[in-house]
């Protein structure tokens, strides 16, 4: 706690250009402490082992190679249950008790928005939060210590809905959304796409994080006789809504989800219920049997190391963590958050899961590509090439 308190109390002195001897919180001669908060007990818990293990795999590789600049990584994982209030408790422990150097790969739009400003104000790097980037950035007042990698949900939903309208000519469009940052931001993109076509929602229905019954929301769409349902959903909600559509025998409606619902875990858990689902997203959906040979080898190594099945979320968490490890390496022995931030701002990064080499433009991932996929025969199948 002492280093974190020193940072808070001396922030004004440092900002004034007066040198201090305080070291970075979470950094000792032999160790760098990283933290994250994930949904370990809530509606998205089934997908969290992939994110946690993907991170741990890359950190273990760095540690097995002797560490970075003489230091090894230690990862502390806390539960946010997809609830902002749980995230507040988690971040308090990570900052005060564990004194983490950085928060990496934290999950959830609402949980991240609830705590990001507290973290950066106390000098912790906040890297690659999984959630609504523009809302998280706004909450953090565009802090130089925040680096967002999740594409802007409004932008990608605008592109995805526009493509669906142009391709399938739906007469009526409905929107089912999670109340909070996720649904609000995705909804902005949906409304923009509809307005450009002279359209508006034929029906809309919200749900709360943690809800498991979506019969009333789907019934509202059915009553409005929509041709396309756009859903702002994560894992369980995506499957639940599709299951309701199938139960009604509603075969002539199309359903489009965004990045959080366009995942391999949705296929594993949803099975036949998600057949025909459309998804719009911004990274490649590799499987253990698809992709280039290095990716196949990575999946095989993951399966040897962990008990759960690997998916693209594990690979994505690994790729993000790899970027962070490289930035720590590039920052040098005298490690500070500012030096890591400078490295991230001035270098580019590549990985097979990304559609292109990535940079941080204004501390946000750039460029943002979008691809439309559909579940066919139990697998995500590309319908488009990556689009900007």
What do the predicted segments below correspond to?
Residues 1-33, 386-388:
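Short, low-complexity disordered leader/linker segments with a strong preference
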Residues 27, 31-56, 78-85, 107-108, ...:
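Extracytoplasmic "Venus flytrap"
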Residues 27-29, 53-75, 195-199:
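Signal peptide-proximal N-terminal region
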Residues 33, 46-53, 65-139, 207-214, ...:
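Beta-alpha junction/loop-to-helix N-cap segments that form part of ligand/metal-binding clefts
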Residues 87, 148-172, 213-215, 238, ...:
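Hydrophobic alpha-helical segments within soluble ligand-binding/sensing domains
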Residues 99-203, 254-278:
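Extracytoplasmic ligand/sensor domains, especially the bilobed periplasmic-binding protein
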Residues 245-318, 330, 381-387:
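Extracellular/periplasmic periplasmic-binding protein-like sensory domains
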Residues 304-314, 325-379:
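Segments of small-molecule ligand-sensing domains
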């Amino acid at each position: 706690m002492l280093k974190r308190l020193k940072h808070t109390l001396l922030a004004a002195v440092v900002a004034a250009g007066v040198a201090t001897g305080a070291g970075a919180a979470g950094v000792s001669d032999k160790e760098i402490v990283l933290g994250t908060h994930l949904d370990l007990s809530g509606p998205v818990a089934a997908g969290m082992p992939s994110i946690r293990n993907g991170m741990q795999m890359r950190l273990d590789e760095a540690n097995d190679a002797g560490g970075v600049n003489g230091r090894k990584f230690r990862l502390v994982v806390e539960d946010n249950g997809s609830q902002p209030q749980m995230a507040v408790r988690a971040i308090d422990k990570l900052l005060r008790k564990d004194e983490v150097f950085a928060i990496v790969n934290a999950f959830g739009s609402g949980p991240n928005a609830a705590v990001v400003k507290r973290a950066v104000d106390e000098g912790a790097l906040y890297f690659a939060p999984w959630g609504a980037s523009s809302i998280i950035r706004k909450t953090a007042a565009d802090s130089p210590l925040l680096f967002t990698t999740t594409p802007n949900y409004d932008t990608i939903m605008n592109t995805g809905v526009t493509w669906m309208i142009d391709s399938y000519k739906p007469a009526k469009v409905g929107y089912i959304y999670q109340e909070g940052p996720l649904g609000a931001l995705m909804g902005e993109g949906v409304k923009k796409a509809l307005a450009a076509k002279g359209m508006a929602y034929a029906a809309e229905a919200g749900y709360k994080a943690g809800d498991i019954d979506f019969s009333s929301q789907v019934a509202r769409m059915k009553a409005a006789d929509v041709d396309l349902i756009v859903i702002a959903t994560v894992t369980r909600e995506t499957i639940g809504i599709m299951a309701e559509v199938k139960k009604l025998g509603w075969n002539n409606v199309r359903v489009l989800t965004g990045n959080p619902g366009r995942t391999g875990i949705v296929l594993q858990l949803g099975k036949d219920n998600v057949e025909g689902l459309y998804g719009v997203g911004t990274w490649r959906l590799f499987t253990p049997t698809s992709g280039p040979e290095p990716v196949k080898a990575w999946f095989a190594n993951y399966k040897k190391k962990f008990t759960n099945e690997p998916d693209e979320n594990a690979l994505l968490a690994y790729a993000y963590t790899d970027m962070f490890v490289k930035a720590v390496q590039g920052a040098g022995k005298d490690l500070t958050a500012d030096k890591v931030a400078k490295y991230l701002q001035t270098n580019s990064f590549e990985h097979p899961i990304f559609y292109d080499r990535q940079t941080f433009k204004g501390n946000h991932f750039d460029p943002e590509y979008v691809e439309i996929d559909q579940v066919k025969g139990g697998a995500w199948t590309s319908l488009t090439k990556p689009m900007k």
